Amino acid sequence: MSKILILGAHVATAQIVIDRLLAETQADLALYLRHAARLNRYQPNPRVTLIEGDAQDVAALTAAMADVDVVYSNLGGVQLATFTQAIITAMRATGRTRLIFYSALGALHEVPGKFGQWNEQAIKAYLPGFRESAKLLAAQPEINATQLRPAWLTDKDEVDYELTGSKEPFKGTEVSRQSVADFIVKLIKNPSLYPHDSLGLNKPHTDGNQPAWL
């Protein structure tokens, strides 16, 4: 039986992943978040452990990783690079090697055209953290990280997405949280997929200068 550590477990996409893993697998889940009471509804489940902690706290991260098989990070914010360094330090200390890392479109300067220009301005406060995180992970060959770069997120009840590689221009402008969660669940179920890779996720046929709802 595997055990999965989910960092940033309160995030909407992460909660979709949690529910699907509980329904579709026998994996044990360690849910790491700043305020554990936010996910108290999972407390009665014997397969779930709630861990209250700061993503910068290397000692707490190290303790949380002690017996897990896969680390899935859904952290974000302007301090992301600091969080990423803490994750790397904890993984090296515990000998953990498999990481699923939620990044963002633009992390590799891969978004072309007017949408790329718009995206640079729309999330300019956050892109440095995503880009520095990509560099930090690239410098750790012993950590098998699959980085995800989703398009702008929707709450549409659909699973409809395509992937682009790290050397390919990004496609589309949007993707549903359900779609991103679906891909994360596939990686957790089959951790040998997409080793040492960075993948864009988008809904097909959503090209444009910005997401359609803006």
List the model feature ranges, each with a label.
Residues Q79-T164:
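Glycine-/Pro-rich loop/turn segments that contact NAD(P) or position catalytic residues
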Residues K3, D69-V70, R98:
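Structural motif
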Residues T25-R34:
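Conserved glycine-rich Rossmann-like NAD(P)H-binding loop of the short-chain dehydrogenase/reductase
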Residues H10, H35, L105:
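Residues in the short beta-alpha loop(s) of Rossmann-like NAD(P)-binding domains
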Residues L33-R38, P150-W152:
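Short, polar loop motifs at secondary-structure junctions
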Residues A37-A93:
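NAD(P)H-binding glycine-rich loop region in Rossmannoid oxidoreductase-like domains
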Residues L7-A12, L127-P128, A139, A145, ...:
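Active-site-lining helix/loop region of Rossmann-like oxidoreductase modules
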Residues I4-E24:
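N-terminal Rossmann NAD(P)H-binding glycine-rich loop of SDR-like oxidoreductase domains
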